Amino acid sequence: MTRKQATIAVRSGLNDDEQYGCVVPPIHLSSTYNFTGFNEPRAHDYSRRGNPTRDVVQRALAELEGGAGAVLTNTGMSAILLVTTVFLKPGDLLVAPHDCYGGSYRLFDSLAKRGCYRVQFVDQSDEQALRAALAEKPKLVLVESPGNPLLRVVDIAKICGLAREAGAISVVDNTFLSPALQNPLALGADLVLHSCTKYLNGHSDVVAGVVIAKDPATVTELAWWANNIGVTGSAFDSYLLLRGLRTLSPRMEVAQRNALAIVEYLKTQPLVKKLYHPSLPENQGHEIAARQQKGFGAMLSFELDGDEQTLRRFLSGLSLFTLAESLGGVESLISHAATMTHAGMAPEARAAAGISETLLRISTGIEDGEDLIADLENGFRAANEE
């Protein structure tokens, strides 16, 4: 029987404990495991290489994304670093989105300057620019869709197809939607990665990442390197992640419903100069999103019509939206891209990506939607006070 996403998330690892019959899989905190005899190791010998709790959540994540296997890492950035470590060597070219996550941009730019590989940041919605970059025969193409923070959507199937024709490996960062709303491997990607810190865990109490591959041999290679460079996820984070994963589908449903209501509210506000969400017909890639996604998601961003003082007054008027980085938790968060999530980008790079100084990003939580809109109303009221 082919299981649906919600069933996979809830049932993964249940009733697997043959020793005690635990319904919920136990947490295995031991760092090392004894041998049964001389030169007779068990299935696990050291937790950096393999851990029973991590095994369970890796199987769950692989099944959710339709992959051959998964490698859990200790952060989302470790997942990105693992992919570039495995597939890029000096002289190889990485093609990445011009508006990618600020942490990814900083990592790629820094390692390229050290000669680890070359990187080219491209507007992947511009087919001519993308084809020009692919003509240089990159080894790896990274896709983010929807993009961070402007929620631009690109055609994953098309980009992965073009990458394959160019001989490149395609990897999609699916953090903003989760497998509940998008499955890049089914769209032609070779790899998919997540910051598990976000929607997959959903409670802002785990830092982890994952790489999921379509090919079993690639999974083996990724796992080998993850062990070697010491980026595998911990048992405790694996346990919390698996617990959070069980409510992924209902969390995404409520958060997305709240986001759509907030978008409708923000459309009526005079202080909102620009609004970004894939549900909007004018949003870049709206038609693509309707085709390749199972929902428009719970992330949105908007530009305030004003200066820094307007921004400060607006934020000071909020009480339910927490001013913090990250996203995907049950609580609603708001962040200022230029000084927070994308502070690692040079001002000219932010400008080229369309990230203004008054851009705010919202990660919609699962609070009551009417309360969230009332809180935004308080923010706009404060912003209008001189």
Residue ranges and their predicted role:
Residues 1-6, 12-14, 52, 274, ...:
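Positively charged, small/polar-rich N-terminal and surface patches that mediate targeting and assembly
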Residues 1-44, 385:
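N-terminal glycine-rich, Lys/His-bearing helix-loop that initiates the first secondary-structure elements
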Residues 229-230, 318-328, 379-386:
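A common structural junction motif
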Residues 274-360, 364:
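Conserved C-terminal alpha-helix-loop-beta "cap" of PLP-dependent enzymes
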Residues 109-110, 118-120, 132, 136, ...:
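PLP-dependent enzyme catalytic core of the Aspartate aminotransferase-like
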Residues 8-16, 194, 227, 259-262, ...:
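Glycine-rich, charged/polar anion/phosphate-binding loops
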